[in-house]
UniProtKB/Swiss-Prot annotation:
rRNA-binding found in the keyword field: no
Provenance organism: Sulfurimonas denitrificans (strain ATCC 33889 / DSM 1251) (Thiomicrospira denitrificans (strain ATCC 33889 / DSM 1251))
Name assigned to this protein: Polyribonucleotide nucleotidyltransferase
One GO-annotated biological process of the protein: mRNA catabolic process
Pfam families membership: KH_1, PNPase, RNase_PH, RNase_PH_C, S1
GO molecular function: 3'-5'-RNA exonuclease activity; magnesium ion binding; polyribonucleotide nucleotidyltransferase activity; RNA binding
Gene3D superfamilies the UniProt entry points to: GHMP Kinase, N-terminal domain (3.30.230.70), K Homology domain, type 1 (3.30.1370.10), Nucleic acid-binding proteins (2.40.50.140)
SUPFAM superfamilies: Eukaryotic type KH-domain (KH-domain type I), Nucleic acid-binding proteins, Polynucleotide phosphorylase/guanosine pentaphosphate synthase (PNPase/GPSI), domain 3, Ribonuclease PH domain 2-like, Ribosomal protein S5 domain 2-like
Family statement drawn from the similarity comment of this UniProt entry: Belongs to the polyribonucleotide nucleotidyltransferase family.
Magnesium is among the record's keywords: yes
Length: 721
């Protein structure tokens, strides 16, 4: 393959070939980075224009199994349904490129990104966007800006730009941002929870007295404070702008001549506009008071029909655009000029919140979280390691297990639409992934699997953030330990020139007519996840900083309400499985297990629990169907550990010891020696005379003198002394 351009970037290089392959496409770019090879193509349907007010853009990111020397698993040996990673990558590319298209562009456009070869250390999401942007830039569409992506990691406090996958795996931060040479367009960020060693923790006397990190370690979310995040974004933004300027300079000689594509006319009918403003301004304002999307749409539709009756010659589609424009003008003007929103709230005001936990008696845990006209029923189910979701990405060496899942469902009835419930849509997958990224850093699920399902019962904006809040409450309603209290809030913005207003807890109307969709999740002290999409072409870091701090205030308000609701949680003890973790001094492990596992079996049977002990650091995991059983088992184990250890006796052949008859069997009796070790007194060694029945001579609980006759491994043979 002949490469036209080689670009050296921070921690990586990229080679591009244009015009060698996929020549029938409107634009194509062949990208090689390391051993990764990606082809991105852009194709436009020049014969059709979609008249509706949206951009008919479709992005498909497709991974080929042969790229990693693999054959697809399962019954069918070919690539079929897109994986979650492929779908999420398609969404990232779509959201980054969509703002570039000219206003009024209505031609159906397909961007296809195919991975033909893969390097195990390559960041495929970054390369996918870079390849797609290159294909779009050199195409014959009137787009003159390059978009690219940068990922940022943090290891031991040090920032790494464009990390390898190995570095990203060790990082406490995963920040992905895209933009042009002038503006940020999209941000995705998450913190990654981990173990923090605190040498100031007091050591439990029952634990190993040595300062083992496993014993004094605590789980932390690594949430990122707002000031630190702004500093990181500033560094990444600088490199992003430089990189895009370089791309544009190097790609421009390969750009095709712009095709004279027809765009939708976006100039409004002045006659209609004047008439609607003069005669129906108050009707539109009244419709805006209908907060539900279905009610608002019905009111505007009825207004349209009312006008058409008297203005039969008018085109209804044009009238719809005019009414929509006046509505948008009203919403934005009221916010910018009066600093009041359509529902009467102040710019930073949060809608009323109500929280009910464990509303489903047979579920392990649940929460009904309502904020304004947005309502999420979040249900939690606990399982073991075998319940984890198995998956294998193209860059993985083998099968991976996902033990924390968040599934988001958005049925049509939640917005008053008569539509059947079908398969999972891209938006549902994306919202579930955002909620997962928000909550995953605060839980440590060793040996457990947790599935959260969010059923959106009503939606008027911010349903993904309701999922985060409801998801946290469901975790607490299941008595799962968390390192932070996490809430989510959706921020918005309306701007006109230098004038702007930042909105907290946006509803659907403000999302639709605003310039920014910015979702932020975290604790009172920092951010665990965020997702930002710009609709106006870019955002400055100063405005972003203001939005982050306003979001922090909103989160604190929501967290206060959630913490009050936590006090009233009543657990579903009848169905809720329980797990407890604690540490013991590893030297006591033998006492807990007992000879041939006798002691631990007795604990398991008595308290109906499962017990797992790490022999290296003494970590004990107790799992059972009831919390009371788990607690009783823990207390029993701690009782064994707290009992002073008897000095270990070195038994020698010929030694005489006192022992207790523990159990009588047909072939003899088991005798408990002074340090708790059992030895076998065979029937032939009980007397010089023939013994027909052991119980004729010995009684259980009787104390006798015995002689050590023989050692065989851990087995001790005894005789009557």
């Amino acid at each position: 393959m002949k490469y036209d351009i080689k670009i050296d970037l921070k921690n990586k290089n990229e080679e591009y070939s244009f015009g060698e392959v996929a020549k029938q496409a409107n634009g194509a770019a062949w990208l090689k980075s390391g051993n990764t090879v990606i082809l991105a193509t852009v194709v436009i349907d020049e014969t059709e224009i979609v008249k509706d007010d949206f951009l008919p853009l479709t992005v498909q990111y497709i991974e080929k199994a042969y790229a990693a020397g693999k054959i697809p698993g399962g019954f069918f040996k070919r690539e079929t349904k897109a994986s979650d990673f492929e779908t999420l990558t398609s969404r990232i590319v779509d959201r980054s490129l969509r703002p570039l298209f000219p206003k009024g562009f209505g031609h159906p456009t397909q961007i296809t990104i195919m991975v033909f070869s893969v390097d195990k250390e390559s960041d495929l999401q970054v390369l996918a966007l870079n390849a797609a942007s290159a294909a779009l830039y050199v195409s014959d569409i009137d787009i003159n800006k390059s978009v690219s992506a940068i990922r940022v990691a943090k290891i031991d406090g040090e920032l790494i730009l464009n990390p390898t996958l190995s570095e990203l795996d060790k990082s406490t931060l995963d920040l992905y941002l895209s933009g042009t040479k002038e503006d940020l367009l999209m941000i995705e960020m998450r913190s990654k929870g981990g173990i923090k060693v605190d040498t100031n923790l007091m050591i439990d006397p029952l634990m190993d007295p040595t300062l083992s990190s496993a014993i004094i370690a605590t789980h932390v979310s690594n949430a990122v404070p707002e000031d630190e995040l702004i500093t990181i974004l500033a560094k990444a933004e600088e490199l992003l702008f430089e990189t895009n300027a370089m791309y544009e300079e190097m790609f421009k000689e390969f750009k095709k001549e712009t095709s004279p594509l027809e765009c939708k006319a976006h100039a409004l009918n002045e006659e209609m506009l004047k008439y609607v403003r003069s005669n129906h301004y108050s009707d539109i304002k009244s419709a805006m008071n209908q907060m539900a999307k279905s009610e608002r749409s019905t009111a505007l539709r009825q207004l349209r029909k009312k006008i058409i009756i008297t203005k039969e010659e008018w085109d209804e589609v044009e009238l719809k655009d005019v009414i929509e424009s006046v509505k948008k003008e009203q919403v934005r003007g009221q916010i910018l000029n009066d600093r009041v929103r359509a529902d009467g709230r102040a710019l930073n005001e949060i809608r009323p919140i109500s929280i009910s936990t464990n509303v489903l008696p047979s579920a392990h845990a649940s929460c009904l979280f309502t904020r304004g006209q947005t309502q999420a029923l979040v249900v939690l189910t606990m399982g073991g390691p075998k319940d984890a979701q198995m998956f294998e990405n193209l860059t993985d060496e083998g099968t991976q297990n996902e033990n924390f899942m968040v599934h988001y469902n958005f049925p049509g009835f939640s917005v008053g639409e008569a539509s059947p419930i079908m398969g999972t849509k891209r938006r549902e997958l994306g919202h579930g992934n955002l909620a997962k990224r928000a909550l995953e850093p605060i839980v440590n699920l060793e040996g457990q699997t947790v599935r959260l399902v969010s059923e959106i019962l009503e939606s008027n904006g911010s349903s993904s953030m309701a999922t985060v809040c409801g998801g946290y409450m469901a975790l607490r309603a299941a008595d799962i330990e968390t390192s932070d209290t996490i809430a989510g809030i959706a921020m918005g913005m309306v701007s006109e020139g230098d004038k702007y207003a930042i909105l907290s807890d946006i509803m659907g109307l403000e999302d639709h007519d605003g310039d920014l969709d910015f979702k932020v999740t975290g604790s009172k002290d920092g951010i665990t996840a965020m997702q930002m999409d710009i609709k106006l072409g870019g955002i400055s870091l100063n405005i972003l900083k203001e939005a982050l701090y306003q979001a922090k205030e909103g989160r604190a308000h929501i967290i206060n309400i959630m913490q009050e609701a936590e006090k009233n949680i009543s657990f579903n003890d009848g169905v809720l499985p329980s797990t407890d973790f604690f540490h013991i001094n590893p030297s006591f492990i033998g006492d807990i297990i007992g000879q041939a596992g006798k002691t631990i079996r007795e604990i398991i049977e008595k308290f109906e629990v499962a017990i797992d002990i790490d022999k290296k650091d003494g970590k004990v995991k107790v799992t059972g169907k009831s919390k009371s059983g788990v607690q009783a088992a823990r207390e029993h184990i701690e009782g064994i550990v707290s009992t002073p250890k008897m000095p270990k006796i070195e038994y020698k052949v010929g030694d005489i010891h006192k022992g207790i008859v523990k159990k009588i069997v047909e072939f003899g009796a088991f005798i408990e020696l002074p340090d708790g070790v059992d030895g076998l007194l065979h029937i032939s060694k009980i007397s010089d005379q023939r013994v027909e029945k052991v119980s004729d001579i010995l009684k259980e609980g009787e104390e006798i003198n015995v002689e050590i006759l023989e050692f065989k491994g851990n087995k001790i043979s005894l005789g009557i002394a």
